[in-house]
Each structure stands twice: as C-alpha cells, then as structure tokens.
Amino acid sequence: MDFSELSVECLLTKLVELGFDQTREERSCKYTDRDFVQLGCQRVLGSFQSGRDFLQHQHEVEQTKIARSTFFKALQSSRRLQVCEDVSRGILKVLNEQMDTLEVDYLKQFSALNEYEVYAGDGHFIEHACHTKLIDSKKEQRRTGKLPKLHAAGLIYMQNLRNGLLSLFAPVSDGTRKNHEMPIFRNHYEKFKAQTNKRVIYVLDRAYVDKVWWSRKMGPNVDFISRSKSNFSLTMCGDMGFDDNKEINQGVKRDFLAGLGGNSAAFRFIDYKDPETGNTYQFYTSNMDLEPGLIAWLYFKRWTIEKTYDTSKNSLCEQKAWATGEGALQVQAHFICVVYNILRFINEITLKSMDEDEKISYRKKYADWIKKREEKAIKKGRSINLLLKNSLRMPKIAIQFIRFLKNNFHSPLPLRRLLPILRLRLINYVVF
C-alpha cells in the first residue's frame, strides 16, 4: 500500500486500523477502543496543557463530546492498556516493514551487524500527574528510613538503531516511589526479547550494570554494550587481538578479557581514547565477535535515544503524566511511541523524495559542523573520528517539520502533495 496517497489524518487512521488486527482485546463500547487510540494520538500531536484542555478542544473545535470521567477511566483501564500495547506493537510491525521497503538502515555499512537487531535503551522521566498521592507514610518510612515524597514519573524505552523506531520497554515509576532501572529491566527482559527472532544487542548506560545477571544471560542470541564503572575489580584473562590499521578501530588502545570480582564469567573490555578530545573511555560487552571500534561506536550512537527524548519532551510537549497510576503512564507512552514512529516514517518518506541537490543542501549544515570540529581538532594536534564523516547519521526530527504536520493534520491533501513543503522544512529553518 502507498501510504503517501493518504492525508496525515487518514494515515494515522489506517495505521490504527492495521494495529487493531493484532489485538483480541477490542470490545464494543460507547467510547470505542479505536476512538480512544485515535484521540490519544491526537492529544500527543496537539500540545495541550491538560486533559481538560484537550477535552474542551474536542468539544468546541472537533465537535466530539467526551465525558471527563469516561476519558480518564479509560486511561486507567487495564484492558485498554492491553489494547494499546497490542495496537502499538502492530503499528510498529507495519512501520518496520515500510522502513525495509524504503531501505532505511542506518547501520547498513557495517556488514558485521547484518544478523543483529541493535537497540539503544534508557530511562525517560517526566513530571508526575498532578493528582498523584503519597503512599502510606508510616509504611514507607519503615521501608526506607525516611519520609516519603513524590518523584518523577518514568519509563524505559528502546529505540531501534537501524530505523529509529521507538517502543516502550517497561514503566519505572508513576511518581509515588523512586525505583532503579536495572531491576525493572530484568523483570521485563524476556517479554521484550520474545518480539524478535534475530540476535539482539542492547546498548545501555551504566545504570544497567549487573555482572551476575548479565553473565547468566550471555549466549548466542543476546549481547549488551555498556561502560565500565570506576569500582570494577578486574581479573585479567588475556588480550584479544585487533587490527589497529582498520578505520573502524581508530582510537582503540586495548581489547582484552577480564572477570569481574568473584564472577567466573569473562567479559570483553575495550580501552578507547577519543582522537578528537583525548578523553578516555572503557567499554565492556558480552559480544566477542565485533570489531572493538564498532563496539565503541555503537555506544556513542546510544545518544540517539536522548535526542528522541528531547523530541518527545520539547517538540511534542509531553512533559507531564496524563493520569495517576502506572497503567495510565504506559497508555500515554504507547501513544507517544505511535506518534513518534509515524513522524519518523514521514520523515524518511520525505528524505527519500529529495533529489540530489536537495540532499546536498540538507546535509550541508552537518557537513559544515563536522568541518569546524575537524579544523578545531587539527589546531590542537588531534583528529576527529573518521566515522563522523563516513557513517550514516540518523537525523533528529526537525521541530518545524513536526509543527507543519501538526498544523496540517486535518488537511485533505495527500502526503504526496505535502512533500515539497516538508522537504523545505527539513532543508531550511524558516523565520516567521
């Protein structure tokens, strides 16, 4: 199906319809599940200050009257949560196939990664819902030794580093309690892993260090990449050979195996010195096959998910939980994933439609930035990592691009007719 022949609103409607093919939880209600998902995505696109603001807009502008209690009870419904999870996964499946059709693969130059799915993962925290209540103070004081307080609401997301599509991994906290991310990751790992048959590499920060658990999970189908902690006690097991003449291994100083403390499993450690800044890093991983420089590069590409969080928080204005409870927080997260993935898909369609001159203009700003960095490094007697110039870069979705799609959500024009303006929004920053 050619999605570019649909308007933005019809594209969302069609993808939601395809997503519902993946769920068995849909029921016939006055406030239908399809309306719930559709309106939830529209709220993400609308930059509303609150749920009441959104409902008033629906009533006065869209001529759709929804009772406040109906909307907020739907957000907290466990059945509707399952519907949203199934639909989000179904839409993700459709968009993965569409990305393959568009030949979107930001890791394609690294043939060693062809057999892997590579995910960047991290926690993302926003303000808790305004009606979030403190949990029982005496019980919590006995548990932690201090009086309870409200915290940020947070979730763990995973982003596919091949095509940029985002998916919810697990909730961390609705704000009533501060939780560490690694126990949450351990509890939901098997469920997420079951979604793919390929080998998986998780690129995670140091919040996900757990030498005992990872040593049990080390195997042919799953690997992780992270950074070492300063308190690691290493038991040397021997060096691994690598070719320091390869471009990919620029900056690698050492590649070796070591045990952690009393753990019998040996992990791979890579000492890396950034040729541009001189900063040193030590990465550790369970993968024994990839070039050490590629391990380091994948960790640096983890920053992609931080740019995605910036898009969610500042471009889509999703800075606060919609309702109390982890269930409502997950529903909101699924809506954010659906909207972000559709924006990413339209972004790739727009890039694909550019002619050569437009592609050169689009890449010029990044090329000029890299050139300035290179000149600055040369003055200091250093150099930049060649992969900065020679590898594919997953762009952050431009704010003017998102604003244009928001403003034209109800436009009857097909996406194909909007592409000329969308290309301009990517190439030039227009001052209004």
Regions found by a protein language model. Give the residues of each.
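A short, flexible helix-boundary coil/loop motif
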Residues: 1-22, 27-30, 241-272, 314, ...
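Dynamic "connector" segments at or just before major functional cores
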Residues: 1-52, 62, 85, 89-102, ...
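Short, conserved catalytic/metal-binding motifs centered on acidic residues
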Residues: 39, 54, 66-72, 116-126, ...
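Active-site-proximal, Lys/Arg-enriched surface segment
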Residues: 75-161
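An internal, acidic/charged active-site-proximal segment
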Residues: 169-279
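A conserved active-site cap/scaffold subdomain adjacent to cofactor or substrate pockets
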Residues: 274, 278-305
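Short amphipathic alpha-helical "interface-anchor" segments enriched in bulky aromatics
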Residues: 295-323
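Basic, amphipathic alpha-helical segments enriched in Lys/Arg and hydrophobic/aromatic residues
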Residues: 323-348
